[in-house]
Amino acid sequence: MMNKTDLRNLTQDEITEYVVGLGQPAFRGRQLMSWLYRPGITQFAEMTDLAKDFRKLLAEHARLSRFEDPILERSSDGCVKFGFGLDDGRMIETVLIPEPDRNTLCVSSQVGCAMNCSFCLTATMGFIRNLQPAEIVNQVCAVDDFLRSQPEEERIGPEKVTNVVFMGMGEPLNNLENLLKALSILTEQRGLDLTNRRITVSTCGIVPKMRLLGENSDANLAISLHAIDDATRSKLMPINERYPLDELLAACRDFPMPKRKRIMFEYILLKGINDSEAAARELARKLRDIPCKINLLPYNESPGIPYQSTPMRQILAFQKILMDANYSVFIRNSRGTDISAACGQLAKKEEANQQNPTP
């Protein structure tokens, strides 16, 4: 089975190329793509408008991967954390954040992470491997299946995923090739048909790859900033040693995007570390010429991580300074904390400390 081509790893262009390689006309590629992500389709025999001989050929040479029997943890606030088993026995986590008008899915792009951010529980896993495009896309497919299976009276939001944020396990830009393929499938009309404005890719600042993302995708960009001076940021995020703040912010100014779009800067507030009024004023100064909005994140404390949350009154004071400087500033409502599903809390315990080299 494993030597068969997993069609969910392929973009529309690659599907067409694959079909032609099987001796079929190119239009079969469009037909096939329109079936791969339909609800409930698990076998080629179910693709009823494809020629019978073509379906048989596909069954011999290809497969449709999917996640089955996820481990579910439900939060008291409605969030659901999914644990998905991969073919090699590894596990990844994905979080559904439902609201009445939308379902946001926080997806993973790697097993573990090499960035070693000192406030993030995923860092304790080390980097294990990149996810394939199918392993990224199948997180969305599996949660769509879950939502459709729920009685209407039990659903908080719509019956499918409407928004995708790459803020789960891993640094998305360190898996750029597979990320771009996954984004193509997610936004393909014959694929999952999401709009780019509802997809956000968050990075800790892999500067050389930021422009490549902007040139090859219209997804929204979020920057995990978390400090506004190099000494503090390098302590929190070792990647800052390689790409210091001035270089990162220059890349943000140079990021290709439509005039109406803005970069989202994410800023975790850590008690006594980066939450002073002086830090807020410096943040306002440094972001002055970048089209942006700012998302303030109350820190979600985790066992073994030596940081504390900033009191809400201080977060509000920090926000006011930024708003007085004419920034759009939001305070993220932490959800899923009771099941370790909030920002920075995703990590499979059995994977912890299995360190591999940086990809």
Predicted features, each with a name:
Residues 80, 92, 103-107, 115, ...:
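Generic beta-strand structural signal
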Residues 144-154, 159-325:
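Conserved AdoMet/S-adenosylmethionine-binding subsite of the radical SAM
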Residues 75, 108-109, 202, 224, ...:
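Short linear Ser/Thr-Pro motifs
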Residues 1-92, 98, 151-152, 253-262, ...:
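Auxiliary Fe-S-binding modules of radical SAM enzymes
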Residues 96-97, 178:
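Residue-level structural signal for beta-strand termini and adjacent loop
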Residues 98-145, 149:
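Canonical Radical SAM [4Fe-4S] cluster-binding loop centered on the CxxxCxxC motif
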